[in-house]
Amino acid sequence: MSTSSSRLFFDCGSLDWPNKSLFGDPTTRDVMDEHISSTWNAVIRRHMLAPNADAETILGRDGLPSAQFDAYGAMLPSFIQALNAPTTRLRISAPLSTAESILCADASHAPWLYMANSVCAYEATHLQPVQTFIAFNFAHGYCYLSLFIPLSFRITPENARSFSRFLEQLPDILGAYPTLASLYKTMLFAVRLFPEVLQAPIPIIAKRPGVLQFHVSDARGLPPSWFPMKCGSVASFIALITNNLNSDLLNGIVGSNGDGEHYTNWNSGHNHWIVNRFITVKDLHSSLKSALEVDLDTEGGRNAVLDLLLDLGVTNLVRREKRFPAYFQGAESVYLLLSCERVGNELVAVQDALQEPLANYTGKDLRALIINLGGLPSRHPEICYTRNIFENDNHLVWNFEFYRIASITKNAQIDRDVLSSSMANLFSDFVSESSNGEYRVKEPRPVTQYRVEHDEPVASGAPSAWWQVLVGITTAILGAIIFFLWRCFLRAKRVKFQAKDSFPWFTTSGDDDLPPPPGDSPSRPPGRSPDRVLPRTVVRDLSFNDDDDLHSVDLNEAGSRFGEVVSLIARGNLRELAGAIPESLSNLTLLQTSASGSGFYTMVALYLATLGDAITAFHEHNDASPATIQSLRTLELQLEARGLRFNEAGTPANLIQRGVKSSVGRALVRLTQSALLATGENFRTRMAATLERIAAERLNTLTAYDQRVIEMTTELLAAIKTALEVERSELTPHLANAEALLQVYNNLFSTDYASASLLALRREMILRSAEGRVGEQPTSASDAANEELVQRSMTKLDKEIELFQAQIDSQRRAVTITEASNLRENILQPINTVANIAMAGAFLRGGARHRMPGIPDVAAPMSNPFRAFSGRGHSLTTTRGAGLFRRPRV
């Protein structure tokens, strides 16, 4: 944490403290060597506590003050108040646990240790002052440097230069907040090099009660109730730790939790990595496989693939406080940089092909182009990164670990060699899995082999060519077997990143200023610049902070199925959605009760439930009420505002609306009405046209409603045709069958059609029946009797006609009742939808906000993006950007 500097006579901020007077008589005082003095001068300049920083507190692991120095300063501010202070408060103590008693002791009997002074620090006897400096305090995390100040006075002149080099490297090697074990190893190393420091006294090392946190004391004294370690010299410190190497206290940090871990030499020239896009090779191949499942012979399918490519990759993968992800298992976890012109140029070619008319590029041609994109890692291995490669190429050091530079460089070379030999195999596997051997693409060009450069030339004979071939074949076979087994092991553990916004971004920064410290606001607020058009919604990074939009979704928490639902919504395939919605609703119900950011899940569940009802109504009746369509559009607009992308070529609501308007079944019902109204040859002509249309539509993909219309229409027309062509003696059953089918047809499809041909046959049959009954009367009857019989026959005929008309009227009343109920549904459903949306909004504003807050947003630096694609799409994530290319509007 902090420590002291020169004992006396410090004035005007002078840094000549090593030459000032120290303890003891001037004739017997110790004097620091000149070389060591200049080294301490440089160390103090680099690691001193800022003048405006709070030097009276110690920060805890949570970054908040955990202790206050000068415990007696508040109790004894004046002589009178000191006399009036209660004696029970003058003893500072805390219970000492068994684990702490191994290394520490209770010092409540020595109250002067907890008093601040301007003279000295103390060692473990609690009485002997320690030679140290009191004019300066070290920064948080570097209080351990106080241990080496007394050692500086014991160094012999012949070891002065070596000890100076040791001091110069000490802060860089240990860094901030080393563990007690690291400090112990450093002391062992110092004693081996400089045995004269063995009996040098050291300041008290104090431990915080109940917490693995240590502090090397200085003139400010010990924090209240902290325990001193049982060591007062270098020898006693080494002996104490050596006898207790199994203690968990050795894992405690020396210092406090100040700035935290970060890249030590990160500057504004590295800020473009924050907004650059990366994607793992596994996620790239998985996204391209999803694109190959889309029907590329349709306009909607091409738009969906274009939008999927727009949203590849993640940003905010690395920044000053966030280390580049570690390289875990297999070359599939390597990150490919998407924000570069070489990748962008290849994607521009695919974009142009997707935007061409359907006649210019067939679906097979587009599939070949998409498969060829899978070879990006093998064609550009120089932009594939692991942690070692990234830190080595950018000369970045994490948390002052300068001693790891050599190992990082060596491991980066090893990673490069592994990538150069494995990327081609990954591409070959991707091609075989995605095309089933149907497509042949260009082999990736040979990758430059990187060789380790030795300090001295290494002479080696030329190996045999046959030996090289044999080794290559054996290695390839073994590698293929191991890789296949490894893929089988990882297949069940595949975890996908949530895809990002507009792709790709290529940024440069010519600024060399240091980045603002954590917690400070940026020098200028993010906004629009003259040469950059920001997307309508902010580009999502990997830090989720909101509670009510797609940014809050943690895919590790939600699971891959939720991401698949988002992808299905983006693709707009109604059949796939209908099958996935029931299971997705059950998953969303679980997420609403257990996951963070559940407000977004609630709104998605409401949308999926409404969409499921609409899809069911569309498939069964080829109809969707205007209220349902309006509800879907309202929810889609709200979800789009919260980060869920919808395809401009057709959201699910638009697809349903278009499907209703272009319904094959409804078109056939209208054609059937036209045929039923005709008679004679006109009926036969229209019936033939209707049957021809039915034969053509059978070859297409039809809904269940369309299938029912085709079957019923075919059966009805066949029955009418049979009734028209049958002999009059056999007319009655066929006519009854045709009329019954017509009534069923009207009931199924909510129509009130009547067949002119069937009505004509019915009237003809009634008249023939009446004439037959009239002709059967006895010839001896009088004319009056004949007239009465004719009158009765006519009355019976009129009653039959009225009965037939009553049947038609009952069908019309049923249709009227159905229309009235639909009207009531259209009126009530918008009210229910508005109420549901209001409840969801109340939940988003209320309950979801009561969760624990997320990490504060960090504004990404401004940059000039290079975009291969732009345009608002419906794919894996959120935003639309405006750039050089735009999708033409129709």
UniProtKB/Swiss-Prot annotation:
UniProt EC number: 3.4.22.45
Active site: 143, 215
Pfam families, alphabetized: Peptidase_C6 (PF00851), TMV_coat (PF00721)
Sorted UniProt keywords: Hydrolase, Protease, Thiol protease
Region described as Disordered: spans on this chain: 508-533
Post-translational modification (record): The viral RNA2 of bymoviruses is expressed as a single polyprotein which undergoes post-translational proteolytic processing resulting in the production of at least two individual proteins. The HC-pro cleaves its C-terminus autocatalytically (Potential).
Domain Peptidase C6, first and last residues per copy: 135-255
GO molecular function terms attached to this record: cysteine-type endopeptidase activity; structural molecule activity
Site (Cleavage): residue numbering on this chain: 255-256
Biased composition annotated in UniProt, kind: Pro residues: 515-528
Enzyme class: hydrolase
Name used for this protein in its record: Genome polyprotein 2
Record organism: Barley yellow mosaic virus (isolate Germany) (BaYMV)
Annotated gene: RNA2
